[in-house]
A protein has these predicted regions:
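Conserved active-site alpha-helix within GNAT-family acetyltransferase domains
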Residues: 97, 120-128
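Conserved acetyl-CoA-binding loop-helix of GNAT-fold acetyltransferases
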Residues: 86, 92-105
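Short amphipathic alpha-helix that is part of the acyltransferase structural core
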Residues: 1-33, 53
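Conserved GNAT acetyl-CoA-binding A-motif
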Residues: 107-120
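Conserved beta-strand in the GNAT
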Residues: 51, 57-68, 80, 85
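Active-site rim helix/loop that mediates acceptor-substrate recognition in acyltransferases
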Residues: 28-53, 69-70
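Conserved acetyl-CoA binding element of GNAT-fold acetyltransferases
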Residues: 74-88, 115-117
């Protein structure tokens, strides 16, 4: 696995066009409105969105829902890691691991347990 210097930080509005364009080029339906909604949820402290950049280029992201959508997690106040993506050209570089490490460290400040949702149908794409 090749490793690289990755900058991981919270999503801001300036990131949205580049993120939406990156997924549009892959043919994935992840419009700018999705990230604008995430930004609103982030401002309301419902979700944190961590974005990864390699040499200034968007490489991937992961979100933490502080009040899980999955009822068994929500009932026990377990934060949920959802919508975790690394662009294909940046896979096998440790970016996903670094995003997950960041999520785990943030969650550890409020919970000993983290939940994660996984898509298991072909339209979700490759697990990373």
């Amino acid at each position: 696995m090749k490793t690289c210097n990755v900058d991981i930080r919270l999503l801001d509005s300036n990131d949205i066009p580049e993120i939406a364009q990156a997924f549009r080029e892959l043919g994935w339906n992840k419009p700018a409105s999705q990230y604008a909604h995430y930004l609103v949820e982030q401002a309301l402290e419902l979700r944190d969105v961590y974005v990864a950049f390699v040499e200034g280029t968007f490489a991937g992201y992961l979100t933490i829902c502080w009040k899980a959508g999955y009822e068994p997690f929500r009932e026990k106040n377990i934060p949920e890691i959802v919508d975790f993506n690394v662009l294909p050209q940046f896979r096998r570089m440790g970016i996903g691991s670094q995003l997950m490490d960041k999520a785990e460290s943030e969650i550890a400040m409020v919970s000993r347990i983290a939940g994660i949702g996984m898509g298991v149908t072909a339209d979700y794409g490759a697990a990373q």
